[in-house]
Amino acid sequence: MDEEAFSEYERNYETARDDSLMWKKPSGSFNGVIYPLEGFNFRGVCWYQGCSNIYGAEKNHDKALNALISCWRRFFNNPELTFSIAELARFVEDPDAYSVINEKIGIVARGDKLVCNAINLDQGDWADIHPRDKHVIGTRLANETLRCFFGKDENAAPKVVSCEIVSDKEVRLFMNENVVLKNGANGFEVLTESGYSLNCEATIENNVITLT
């Protein structure tokens, strides 16, 4: 944007904002921050997923995210508007809900060729809901954007392509790329039918992760 465009945005923002915790109100953030951008042209959106959606709304997050994407494409009059989504980093508060949110983000990305997602599960901080090393998250998001929408030869984020239940004590995950871990295979969990997370051992060979 040029200087005149920024000045116009500031005037619109001051008109639209509500100083009484607008971000907590329905459509508050959109009306206060996004609405003033009406009429501008954008190639894509980088979406840093927040944590407010984990409080009971995580199971329907794919529907909410798809609705947001459709709404923004209509608002900016651009059906080809791309979305690059940074998944949530891990945090001690209700970690299962975080996993559900990230799973829903992956579902949306797989169902829309104009949506990609960057995985940040390993970037969590036990003492801070906001990851400290934003550079890593930004780099991953940029690499996924360049790879998916600009044809750049960047390494793909690790994703599970398929899985095989070998027995009631062994599961194999088949990844999209060979997996290399700096600090060994730790932090793996499985979710039981009753909804409980269980720690498990993991061994890695090429693109196959075996959980026991």
Predicted regions and their residues:
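Cell-envelope and extracellular/periplasmic
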Residues: M1-T212
